[in-house]
Amino acid sequence: MNFSVLPPEINSALMFAGAGPGPMLAAASAWTGLAGDLGSAAASFSAVTSQLATGSWQGPASAAMTGVAASYARWLTTAAAQAEQAAGQAQAAVSAFEAALAATVHPGAVSANRGRLRSLVASNLLGQNAPAIAAVEAVYEQMWAADVAAMLGYHGEASAVALSLTPFTPSPSAAATPGGAVIIAGFPFLDLGNVTIGGFNLASGNLGLGNLGSFNPGSANTGSVNLGNANIGDLNLGSGNIGSYNLGGGNTGDLNPDSGNTGTLNWGSGNIGSYNLGGGNLGSYNLGSGNTGDTNFGGGNTGNLNVGGGNTGNSNFGFGNTGNVNFGNGNTGDTNFGSGNLGSGNIGFGNKGSHNIGFGNSGNNNIGFGLTGDNQIGFGALNSGSGNLGFGNSGNGNIGFFNSGNNNIGMGNSGNGVGALSVEFGSSAERSSGFGNSGELSTGIGNSGQLSTGWFNSATTSTGWFNSGTTNTGWFNSGTTNTGIGNSGGNLVTGSMGLFNSGHTNTGSFNAGSMNTGDFNSGNVNTGYFNSGNINTGFFNSGDLNTGLFNSVNQPVQNSGWLHTGTNNSGYANAGTFNSGFDNNARDEHAEFVTGNSGLANVGNYNAGIINVGDHLSGFRNSVPTITGTANISGFVNAGTSISGFFNFGSLMSGFANFDDEVSGYLNGDSRASGWIH
């Protein structure tokens, strides 16, 4: 175990949660007693056999008995010396433990430090607590270093104690009989406390281990003819799938060449649906990525039969249209041919109205440029709106060309802009920044989802590229509240932190199951790798509630792993039900247990990742201001609700370092903003 990568929450808990030095002291006392008993037995046995050999029992039988008895007496004497050495080494182990315990930071101090950090982060809306947060983090790093030093020292001393022990030699009678491990079905089976290492399959023709099925070259499969590992299904080349004929890993469905899909025959990753060529689609028959709908050619569309990106509607050809059957960019309405039109049936650019032919007309049924009114033919002003700088603007307060919305800096926008520091091109959304956005308050390119930051996101409050699920941080995610790439799970619960997961609430990659900590698990609530069973701690288990390797049986226990409070947990020191990973706990007197977490040191319910506080979070160090409650957050170091991205504080946000509500982009302190530095 690499203690240097474990935080003080785990290292301190490992030292303080055990039984302490008492059992080892008892063992030292027992070894001392055994040494005395063996020494007395050796002396007594030698005296008795000597009296027999020098007395009435003479002849060849007596001589043979004397030789065997002498050998056994020597073994008793040697065993007594070895028992005395074991007693001394047990006492040395006690001394090493007590020294390490004294050098380890108390878990209460670690918990108080983390509680102080959460309080500072929750109240740091204006950044005023930054120095205090830095100081708390510095103390935490010192705790981490102290625990690592203590554990490494303890490991070194304990290893030296173990290496100095002399192995016990078998007795003469035992040496004459065959020994070794128990053999079951031709494979070894060991029992190491609550750790089991199985090696048998519950069917025939398997090359791998721990399979519930036949003819599997891989291991821990529930099914047949799987070349990969931990699949529930048949004929999978990849690992961690629920389904059949998958070439990739972590799929829920059939015939997927890639990974993390929920559906059938997807050529790409992170899709929910079937027959998609691309990634992160929520729908079927899409040629592209990040679409919500069917038969789209392009990215970030919400609707059907769109060619292009960032459209909200159906049968659009272009970018950033809100409506149907538009040919162009940034139109709001239907059947427009051109860009930046606010209305329907327009041919041209920047018209505010319907059935206009031309540029910058404000009205209906006009033919010409800059006309204000209806049913006119001719040429009006350069701009038909007021306060414009440019040409062909029918809205107000624009700088640029062919804008039918207001306050835009750019070209061909039918939505309203944000103002300074934001530039819009071909956008139909309100207060968006970028190109071809039909989603309100979006920053980037081709976003049809609201409050998104990035490229071609068709769902709300996402940060990244080609996400069709809501509140994702990353790329090609069709599920909700995921932090990572190509995750299709998370709808109605919480997403995952990792890569290509089709299940929900996973911390890891290629998991088709849910609430796992690790990789390639098709079962649920596992801590480890390649498990097709449920609630296992270890590797390649197709049974349930196992702690170990290659087990295909179900164990009659409440948890797998160690030091849990509750039931159906895997891993280490979780309190509650259906948790995997390490030290997931409520730490709240009003909520003793937590449910459905994966990862490390999460506080709340249905969290995936590391040190999240609240409910329904994925990522690293995210929190909700009230400590408890539904957050719906993905990403890193966010505080609030419905947030994706990095270092955001508020609600309904995406992007980086924003500090108010309903914001996308970067470094914004105003509400209802997109872009940069508002």
Swiss-Prot record:
The record ties this protein, via InterPro entries, to: Mycobac_pentapep, PPE_dom, PPE_sf
Topology relative to the membrane? Multi-pass membrane protein
Which Gene3D superfamilies does the record match to this protein?
Answer: PPE superfamily
Q: Which UniProt keywords apply?
A: Cell membrane, Membrane, Transmembrane, Transmembrane helix
Ranges annotated as spanning the membrane = 14-34, 180-200
Return any one Pfam family short name: Pentapeptide_2
Which GO terms of the cellular component aspect does the record hold?
Answer: plasma membrane
Where is it mostly found? membrane
Name under which the protein is recorded: Uncharacterized PPE family protein PPE21
State the gene name recorded for this protein: PPE21
